[in-house]
Structure formats: structure tokens, C-alpha cells
Amino acid sequence: QVNLFDQTTPITVNNFLRYIDQDSYQDSTVHRSVPNFVLQGGGFKYEGTIPLDRIETFSSIQNEPVLSNVRGTIAMAKLSNSANSATSQWYFNLKDNSVSLDATNGGYTVFGQVTTEQGMAVIDKIAALERCGEVPVVNYTSSQCSDTSVDPDESNLVTVNNIVIIDADPTTAANLSPKSNTLIDNVPTPTPNPVPEPEKSSSGSLLTSLFLMVGIVGRRYRKKR
């Protein structure tokens, strides 16, 4: 389960919910995995061919870098050198990325956090999968990754089956203590490489394993509708 911080980052949460309401994330793929950094999705779908098809996006939103990019948080990916460019893509922080992401590019907006150890265990298992480039894959060899005559199919991808809001109560975040972003007013650090970039396309193979269908359950900390 993921708790969303509606009151702290209302613009971002409402944007995320808008994509959910439009079923934009249904059957989307986890298209980027960077060890000890981030696990990213929300940008592409597999429609029977490679490269993946981009999810249709709404207008970019205002950045809200109030909270810190610590392990277990979910944040919005965006274009490099463009603070207010987030649209549909999100990422989970696999470790404490506050130093590299809280002040860089205007700060990356954290808008929720994983609330259970079981939830993070699933994310860590996906992050530990083999990769083709930065795309996590299952039952797909390195030789297949480099063979341009062979493409992965749906069985080789990590798919987000659906995202469901299970609690819209505005008081659900009352007992949470998200870490504040105290670095945003500092001089920006050099952009880390790699950095979550929504425009970074993926080609090559993708993953799936026991986690072929990954359901993200959102609890509106709503601060939400």
C-alpha cells in the first residue's frame, strides 16, 4: 500500500489521481530500474510491439518539493533542467536519495510513501531482477537483449495491473511523519546520472516474473479528494 500526501502535495496528488481515474496506469509497465537508486513507471504500456507505447499525458504540473526523497517514498519523475515538467511518470526511491534529488532540478516532488514492509519487499524484488539496459526483465537472457531480431513480449515485462484507491479519508495520514525536504534552499547539487527523466524512452526487453502483475494500492492521505 502507498499513502498519498494530499494536504502536503495537493497538486501532485490530484494529478496522480487524475491518471488513475482515466485508467492510464492500468496494464502499464515498470520501464526503468536503476540499482540502489530508483524503480520507475507510469510512462509506457506494451501494446504488442517494442518499443513501448507512451501513456498519453495531461499538462505538466507545478513542482511541490516539500518532502524528502528517502527510501520507500514515491515521487514524480520529470525532465532534466525543468522543475515544473512532471506529468505521468513516478518512481520509488530504493534508498535515501535526499542528497541527490531533494535540491536537484528544483527538487523532485515526493507525494506518498510505501506503508508496509511487504510492499517494499515487492519493490526490492522487482529492482533485483535482471535488466535489459535499464528495463527489468524476467526469463530473458543477455544474449536476447542484444539480439535486435528478438523482442520481449508481455510475459517478459513487469506490469502494473491496476492502481486502486482504498481509503479516501482525509485523516489517514495523521499518524505518518514524512521527512521534510530541508535541502531545497541549498545550492543545487550536480544532476545525478542517471536521474529519473520522463522522456527517457525504453527499448529492449522488459520484465516479469512472479511479479508480472503488480498492483499498487493507494491510500489517500488526503489529503485527497
PLM regions: where:
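Cross-family detector of peptidyl-prolyl cis-trans isomerase
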Residues: 1-202, 206-209, 218-223
